């Protein structure tokens, strides 16, 4: 059963401008430690960060909380399978809230094209 759906669209230039002002400080606010390592090595860091921003905003919307009740960017880790399929891992208070809602499965799609990054998330329970 679908518990929540979330989507987010972000302009990559907006993220690039924030990075210019605060670069790694801004990235540390958005990325979990594992993601930060990949960010530092990425050839297009503004796209990497924009896609993570969109994904995490979409997750918060699927939870129905936004970034309240202890939900935070760094409790959301966006990884990938060997084939490139994006995966969601939650930790901390964000994971607790997902568990309370009965969420057992996440589906996520992330994409970017020229000026924008977009993410779409579905949160599901068994019943």
Swiss-Prot record:
Alphabetical list of Pfam families matching this protein: ACPS (PF01648)
Reactions performed catalytically: apo-[ACP] + CoA = holo-[ACP] + adenosine 3',5'-bisphosphate + H(+)
GO biological process per UniProt: fatty acid biosynthetic process
Co-factor(s): Mg(2+)
Zinc-finger keyword on record: no
EC number: 2.7.8.7
Keyword annotations from UniProtKB, A to Z: Cytoplasm, Fatty acid biosynthesis, Fatty acid metabolism, Lipid biosynthesis, Lipid metabolism, Magnesium, Metal-binding, Transferase
Binding-site residues, Mg(2+): 8, 57
Annotated InterPro entries: 4-PPantetheinyl_Trfase_dom (IPR008278), 4-PPantetheinyl_Trfase_dom_sf (IPR037143), ACPS (IPR002582), Ppantetheine-prot_Trfase_dom (IPR004568)
Compartment(s) where it occurs, according to its Swiss-Prot or TrEMBL record: Cytoplasm
A single GO cellular-component term on record: cytoplasm
Role played: Transfers the 4'-phosphopantetheine moiety from coenzyme A to a Ser of acyl-carrier-protein.
Name of the protein this chain belongs to: Holo-[acyl-carrier-protein] synthase
Native species: Hydrogenovibrio crunogenus (strain DSM 25203 / XCL-2) (Thiomicrospira crunogena)
